[in-house]
């Protein structure tokens, strides 16, 4: 009861303060607190369909959903070339002001391409300071497949961001992990190793994505030795929507019994989750994608560093 009350008081304080962000004052001994909505969304690669899930129909639902959720930063998967061409502009028309960083595991240079994933962030709020990518294989620095994942080339990307108003920095990694059980289990240590390598300052850390695994598998168990699984961490009264994240184009009718394969992990002494949501919205009976978007609200608190004399 005490833990739930603490979360409620934090949330009440945020509502009372509007944005929940303290004013950043250089050389102040008070810490700066930032509220961020972090999430993940598998967009579902377009295919030949003539129903309500056809791309030319559902792309408008997808854009509306993204804009209305109001992510601060989120990871996307199955960000195929057709989606790359259409979705950013549609989201902007709906009022979403985002920068779209793209990594295709099918591009040996790691840039844009088919079957991509990416990091989407509010371009007026954040600056991307650095980015990295790698492949989920025994040779992660070169374009490659790994273990029993024969059909798809899998990878991950990450970045360090700075919030412009406060100077607070954080690390975000995103992946679309293998379906093969052996590949999934072996990819997890690669991801964890790179998360540590690319975040040497131990900044607040987030890891999101369609991880194609369940919470009791070796991959999930390993991730929880480093990060916290937001779904499992927050009290039940601030966990909204369904347990399952994979709606399978509406075929999974009971979403609480559906697979939870999309995740939001976090790490850091100054990182506190306020709530978690799996957004199950439909439009005229159709989901925007075959996965539901997930998001979590966080308070990130770090002491400010003086910039005087720089």
Task: Please place each PLM-identified region on the residue numbering.
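N-terminal, active-site-proximal structural segment of metallo-dependent hydrolase catalytic domains
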Residues: 15-92, 105-114, 299-310
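Active-site neighborhood of phospho(di)ester-bond hydrolases with catalytic His/Asp-centered motifs
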Residues: 75-77, 103-104, 206-210, 229-233
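Catalytic metal-binding/acid-base residues of hydrolase active sites
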Residues: 44, 80, 176-178, 211-214, ...
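Active-site-proximal beta-strand elements of phosphoester/diester hydrolases
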Residues: 35-48, 130-134, 168-178
């Amino acid at each position: 009861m005490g833990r739930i009350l603490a979360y409620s008081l934090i949330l009440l304080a945020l509502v009372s303060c509007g944005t929940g962000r303290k004013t950043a004052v250089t050389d102040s001994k008070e810490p700066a607190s930032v509220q961020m909505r972090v999430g993940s969304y598998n967009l579902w690669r377009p295919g030949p369909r003539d129903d309500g899930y056809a791309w030319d129909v559902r792309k408008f639902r997808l854009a509306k959903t993204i804009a209305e959720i109001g992510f601060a930063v989120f990871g996307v998967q199955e960000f195929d070339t057709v989606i790359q061409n259409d979705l950013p502009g549609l989201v902007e028309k709906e009022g979403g002001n985002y920068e779209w960083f793209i990594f295709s595991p099918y591009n040996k240079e790691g840039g844009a391409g088919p079957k991509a994933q990416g990091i989407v962030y509010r371009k007026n709020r954040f600056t991307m300071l650095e980015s990295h990518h790698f492949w989920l294989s025994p040779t992660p620095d070169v374009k490659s497949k790994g273990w029993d994942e024969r059909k798809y080339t899998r990878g991950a990307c990450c970045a360090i961001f700075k919030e412009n108003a406060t100077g607070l920095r954080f690390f975000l990694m995103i992946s679309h992990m293998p379906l093969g059980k052996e590949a999934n289990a072996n990819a997890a240590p690669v991801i964890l190793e790179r998360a540590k390598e690319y975040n040497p300052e131990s900044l607040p850390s987030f890891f999101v994505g369609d991880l194609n695994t369940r919470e009791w598998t070796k991959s999930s168990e390993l991730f929880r030795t480093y990060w916290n699984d937001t779904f499992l961490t927050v009290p039940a009264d601030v966990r909204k929507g369904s347990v399952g994240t994979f709606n399978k184009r509406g075929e999974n009718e009971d979403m609480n019994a559906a697979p939870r394969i999309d995740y939001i992990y976090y790490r850091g002494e100054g990182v506190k989750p306020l709530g978690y949501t799996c957004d199950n919205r439909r439009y005229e009976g159709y989901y925007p994608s075959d996965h539901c978007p997930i998001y979590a609200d966080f308070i990130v608190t770090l002491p400010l560093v003086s910039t005087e004399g720089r």
